[in-house]
Amino acid sequence: MKIRVGVIGCLGRMGKKILNELITNTKVEIAGAVARSGSKYIDSDIGPIIANLGIKVTSSISDVFESSDVVIDFTTKECMLDCLKAAVKFKTPLVSGTTGIEGVDLKEYAAEVPILWSANMSVGVNVLLKLVKKAAELLGNEYDVEIWEMHHNLKKDSPSGTAIELGKTIANASKVDFQSNQYLHSGSNIRKKGGIGFAVSRGGGVIGDHSVMFVNSDERIELNHKAIDRTTFARGAVQAAVWLYENKREIPGLYSMQDVI
């Protein structure tokens, strides 16, 4: 039996990539696809998006959660909240890569149903997270930490969810409080000692570049990741969905790509 996977936000850049990954993965099949209400594709076959599979695009999140073994969401904070409620109602595991979700208590929903959330589904970025954690543990607080990220000119959240996740990982490894030690460079103030600095760039169609620097007066250690194609995020999301269903479908909890890899 193949794993039935629903996709929320099927017309978005990530949604289309995920659909394409699903049709090439032998472990899964597409159970349903959701687009926002009012889309011209509602009640049409997903054929114009990827391939004629006899699956119609719907605006009903509930219908897709009810008919799926696991659901993948890459949408907005508002839509993700609807997904979380549906996941709890139908006890359907949820994988989400939606960012900009400040104020959402994922643990509250994860107490009822398995939820896997990551700011970045790329295997490479999750390897980077492990590397910066190890570097922070080895270097302690003797190095200034700087995180720089660049994305396309339409990205709304800043710094990116991935950059924040990198910062939190470093703070935890260094045994410092992230909230009181992180800051976004601005104005003419000198650098905060012991702080985790963030710098942000937006331009063109950049998919996602992240750089973490550990710097003292003698040397600089730099760890980088550059996304070349969004397929890396889609492939990771499908991998996460398969892992969540095969390993945790009956075990409520909050998981991440760090658990998958």
UniProtKB/Swiss-Prot annotation:
Gene: dapB
PANTHER family: 4-HYDROXY-TETRAHYDRODIPICOLINATE REDUCTASE 1, CHLOROPLASTIC-RELATED, DIHYDRODIPICOLINATE REDUCTASE
Chain sites annotated for binding (S)-2,3,4,5-tetrahydrodipicolinate: H152, G161, T162
Keywords, ordered alphabetically: Amino-acid biosynthesis, Cytoplasm, Diaminopimelate biosynthesis, Lysine biosynthesis, NAD, NADP, Oxidoreductase
GO molecular function: 4-hydroxy-tetrahydrodipicolinate reductase; NAD binding; NADP binding; oxidoreductase activity, acting on CH or CH2 groups, NAD or NADP as acceptor
Official protein name in the record: 4-hydroxy-tetrahydrodipicolinate reductase
Biological source species: Wolbachia sp. subsp. Drosophila simulans (strain wRi)
Residues involved in NAD(+) binding: G9, C10, L11, G12, R13, M14, G97, T98, T99, S118, A119, N120, M121
Role noted for this protein: Catalyzes the conversion of 4-hydroxy-tetrahydrodipicolinate (HTPA) to tetrahydrodipicolinate.
